[in-house]
Amino acid sequence: MAWFSGKVSLGGFPDLTGAVNKFQESVKNIEKNFDNALGFDDKSDSAAEDAASSMWPPAVDTKSLFDPVMSFMGNTSDEKPDTLEDSVRTENPSQIEQKEEEAGSVKLATEQAVSVEANKETNVRREADQADNPEVTETVVLDPKDDEPQSQILLEESSEYSLQTPESSGYKTSLQPNEKLEMTASQDSQPEQPKSEAEESQPEDSEAKEVTVENKDTVHSPVLDGQHKITYMDETTNEQEILGENLEGRTSSKNFEVSPDINHVNRIESPVAHPSLIFESDGSPYESSIPKRSSSDEISERIVDFVSREIDSRLDTSELNESQRSSSATNVSDSADVILELEKTKKEIKMLENALQGAARQAQAKADEIAKLMHENEQLKSVTEDLKRKSNEAEVESLREEYHQRVATLERKVYALTKERDTLRREQNKKSDAAALLKEKDEIINQVMAEGEELSKKQAAQEAQIRKLRAQIREAEEEKKGLITKLQSEENKVESIKRDKTATEKLLQETIEKHQAELTSQKDYYSNALAAAKEAQALAEERTNNEARSELENRLKEAGERESMLVQALEELRQTLSKKEQQAVYREDMFRGEIEDLQRRYQASERRCEELITQVPESTRPLLRQIEAMQETSYRTAEAWAAVERTLNSRLQEAESKAATAEERERSVNERLSQTLSRINVLEAQLSCLRAEQGQLSKSLEKERQRAAENRQEYLAAKEEADTLEGRANQLEVEIRELRRKHKQELQEVLLHNELIQKDLEREKASRLDLERTARINSSAVSEQLPIARQNSAFENGSLPRKLSSASSLGSMEESYFLQASLDSSDKFSEKRSMPEATMSPYYMKSITPSAYEATLRQKEGELASYMTRLASMESIRDSLAEELVKMTAECEKLRGEADRVPGIKAELEALRQRHAAALELMGERDEELEELRADIVDLKEMYREQVNMLVNKIQ
């Protein structure tokens, strides 16, 4: 390959990045082919990220593998945050442009300093070269006019060393103009070499160009997913740094005499230019799978090998360069530059040795881990082989034999290819054309390794699925046993409930019959007593009504006669009142006329008096005084007559009001008389009836007293029986509540078991679908892998023994990892169940195929269906029992209601007795009231007569 060529520049590794990219591309292509074959293209990104996060370690571990490699490539641990920031800056183009502008300003300043020093050195070297080599093919003049064509040539050369084209991959790499100017400045600062050295460097450059062209044709796809994106960006930035060093190394290989300032500037500027490499994803429909730690370990080991060999080649080249420089050195300045460069190379060699030692330590640790994992894998393989021997399934054995055969063939191929690779590497210093073959071999090795890894993954996934199915079958059988035991217990409970039900029904029927007979007898007795009492009451009421009617008619006649007499007297009184009113009016008119005449006379006398006063002298004044006295007396008499009139009017008004009140009183008295007469008649009738009833009731009372004594005795007996029935009913209620509670609990348990069974059925269905999918995928994978195996059979050279190669170690490590994970998951899943099944041994369970699983699942489904039917029947039985319990409780409530009616009947008897006593009391009270009413009537008559006499006297 090209990086093993003898003339490699000390500034960087020109073809190491191409080799790493080629290696990654081959791994990605193999993974893509396997994913296309297995049909994993349609999987979502979320599933891939979840699988990556659960199965593989974070990106920090992959970074630690590449730290020593990055250290001797010019990046230390302090530069890692810059690379991380560069990876983040790909999402923010505005920030990237700002950083690029800052980097460009720094580079322009450094270029100006470099160009000043380069002009001085070129003038000195030109004279030395012209003196030694008169024939010069190329002349470099550091003029501003000649910078443009040289920069164009360098840009064309730098485009050949670009990582990849946008057409061939999903990423874009662009060199910034500042970086291009840096390259032109570094090349312009170097002196020209003789024609012989230029001709020697041309074939090497052509070879390197061919390698880079081949690298262009390869497809770069994103390897890392999810959490590993940052590490991938770190690797890409490291690769871009190596590319920049390669470009600088190629420019420096033309002239070995480079000033330390220029090298220092290039080293400073190289990491600054790396953020200009922008990777833009074209959004390809396919996303590659996650790289394993084993592939990264293999890459690190190979990089360590490459670095060790390149250090040897560098030492050889440095010795050649020193010999050439010692022979061609003519000036003291050149020798000083060579010494400085040798010191720098020694420092770089020391750094590389330290990095190699760290990488070797890590590789040794990884090798130890791989050896341990291989040992565990061998143990697990021995266990699996023992289990395979005990299994009876031919399909599983055939698949495993095919897998082992494929793994053996792949290991043989890997061994053969590694041998071929070693031979090709030895011959590479002589033949540059063998680089393409080695790359193809590396790709084939990577493909074989990926096939082995995927086969181990598939086997681990199948074993995990088989274990899951076994655990599900165990769970189903355990649940089946639990359901059977619960069904038996429920059947026993139902039988006991039925027995209790029959016993309670018998007791309830007996008690019901007894109470019904007692109630019928008591109802008949009390109904007869009530009918007799009602008949006696009706007869007494009829008698009293008849007597009261006759008395009322007589008294009404008497009251009518009295009313007619009173009406006549009132008419006479009204006539007298009208006559007296007329007389009073006439008298008033007479008095008014007299008063008017007197007033006229008074006025005339006043006039006369005034005239006489005016005419009569003082001698006649006593007469005037007499006249005035007469006038006063007349005035007083008039006032007295007015007062008499007023008193008479007031007496008239009072008499009228008294007459109205008397009429009202008369009416009220008449009403009261009628009411009292009616009441007297009613009471007299009632008295007669009650007297007749009294004799009958006295007789019936004696009979009822005898019956009451008998009823009391019966009541006490019935009360005792009712108390016993109430106690029994309370016991039955408690038992019914307990039965209901038990039924509720059993129902809840049955519902929970039904839910669990449904969940298990869903799980079994899902696992069944997964098995069918895996079977289809395996069949498709087997059908696609057969032609691949036939094509790869041409590479087999006999049956070589197995060795602990990198591919086998990686495959075994992944297989042991998946086996351990599946074993842990199965153990945890089995520990969750409390009753493990001892009949199904793991050796027998591993021999079961998906068809057998389907058969067992169908059996389990049938059993579950039968259990569901039995549960439905049990639920129907439970419902019928609940209905019967409800009926029995209703009957008990009816009996209780009838028992509660007994004290009501007794209360009715007591009420009848009280009514009888009250009737007797009423009889005595009514007699007293009649006597009082008669006395009141006599008093009213006397009062009425007195009032009438008073009115007559007043009127008179």
Swiss-Prot record:
This is Golgin candidate 5. Interacts with RABH1B and RABH1C, but not with RABD1 or RABD2A. The lineage of its organism: Eukaryota, Viridiplantae, Streptophyta, Embryophyta, Tracheophyta. GO terms for cellular component: Golgi apparatus. It comes from Arabidopsis thaliana (Mouse-ear cress). Residues 160-177, 184-193 have a biased composition (Polar residues). The C-terminal domain (817-956) is necessary and sufficient for Golgi and cytoplasm targeting. Keywords: Coiled coil, Cytoplasm, Golgi apparatus, Phosphoprotein. Golgi matrix protein playing a role in tethering of vesicles to Golgi membranes and in maintaining the overall structure of the Golgi apparatus. Residues 70-230, 278-298 are annotated as: Disordered.
